């Protein structure tokens, strides 16, 4: 589908160049365009999910009529908004699987013993190396399920929309905090975060009330609070903050994604004139003014390749663009942002690399050599991951009587829903209406229980329910832990292996500390204890630890913070020693965290955008 933004112009530098079109890149674009800056955004993938809205000034502008006549298509729409997936959430599992590309697949130790001996096979000396297959990847230190999504909107086209705030302990100097420090002063830090979170929630549209009239949601939420209150145990169950809104037909909800953030850049003719979006364009690297470590530097231009002309005619000079801007933002996700910056350490052919090892790389033998990054020494170091436990339960039969006769006051709407359903379907063994919205319950991270909990029903790349089970009585439990940042945990990029898009192959080196492992065991115990209070395990979905990386919340790859010796950028996400280079996304978060990071990453994008606007802003009519 044609995207109606301002065409690319090579003859005039942009104010801001942005690599990446997920919610973080979109936040940069929105705020910079709102501040009268000209923005060029490139996305390696295609635009494959759309909504449409009226143009600004149209008398129907307040209405949201999807794909009405004469309306403007907006990319980056959440694919779960399709009616078929709202009616059957488990069918969305395959959409997620299709969107994800695994980052690093070990191959050196994979011998297929039963392969026909006369066919092509791998060997120890020459293992397979295509499409993420990585001979340099040690399987014992891999994040085996870490994956990326390429396309306008990024993972926001299939995410859960969970947008909790990070935990900050009362003691500013407590040994662990989810929420990073943006100031050394406790009061100022709290004020900054309060303001940023408020803005971020407005941008993405966070709510905790969209499931208030769900029977299952209220059943799970109220039952758990009653159980723990009777046991004299302090555990606070509350609605999970979600970026969504309930539609006029209460059976349906609209899940928010990048389209919400980009909307005015398509519907407002003035803003659209300052915004260019190039899809199927790979940001190959940034070219720097010089390559001398430790000295003040800046980006000269972004080297971008249009993949469509190249696909039709390899070597077509029209496929390569040099995009000049006053400031540059790389916000392609935790893996790809670091990938672009690592690849940027390999300069054009006519530039001599001044740092030792720049020609051959480091990190092992020639075959497994990695790209050195002395211009950004902390790039890829101190990465963090979320250990994750999962199970599904079938609700206790006794709870069906609670559904028929809820013991809590003020629930006439509940009783009316049940009565209508029972009357319409007297042979249904379950009194819950077919279109009753799913539960969306959370337990927040605390010092006593340092993990994030989601008790709900949603689609992931795993956890689909068998067709012969009624999903109305299935509840999912996902517990997310955290790992402490360690310098030895790192993401590096190979010199001699390439990914599917001809970029340096990522390789993980990640292990959990003893404290991390002990905490994960406690988290599993907690999940089992909580889950069994209202049901029994669904066969095949008993409690289990998930493959590392499956949470898709990798962070720390481009960490930003107050300590210049342990970070890639400052608290405004400006890369150290570069006056016009910024990073965005979950990779900037320097702390270990258990909650979903998108809202916090939007906060960083707001703060960084304000810095860009202050430095590079100028009035435009």
Curated annotation (Swiss-Prot):
Concerning Pfam families, the annotation shows: GMC_oxred_C
Which residues does the record list as Tele-8alpha-FAD histidine (modified residue)?
158
| Chemical reaction(s) catalysed | D-glucose + O2 = 2-dehydro-D-glucose + H2O2
Give the record's note on temperature dependence. Optimum temperature is 55 degrees Celsius. Thermostable for 2 hours up to 70 degrees Celsius.
UniProt PTM comment: Not glycosylated.
How activity varies with pH is as follows:
Optimum pH is 8.0-8.5. Active from pH 4.5 to 10. Stable from pH 4 to 11.
Q: What induces it?
A: Induced by carbon starvation.
| Role this protein plays | Catalyzes the oxidation of various aldopyranoses and disaccharides on carbon-2 to the corresponding 2-keto sugars concomitant with the reduction of O(2) to H(2)O(2). Plays an important role in lignin degradation of wood rot fungi by supplying the essential cosubstrate H(2)O(2) for the ligninolytic peroxidases, lignin peroxidase and manganese-dependent peroxidase. The preferred substrate is D-glucose which is converted to 2-dehydro-D-glucose, an intermediate of a secondary metabolic pathway leading to the antibiotic cortalcerone.
Question: What PANTHER family does the record tag this protein with?
Answer: PYRANOSE 2-OXIDASE
Self-association or partners: how does it assemble?
Answer: Homotetramer.
Q: How is the cofactor bound?
A: Binds 1 FAD covalently per subunit.
What is the designated name of this protein?
A: Pyranose 2-oxidase
Q: Which family does it belong to?
A: Belongs to the GMC oxidoreductase family.
Cellular component, GO, one term: periplasmic space
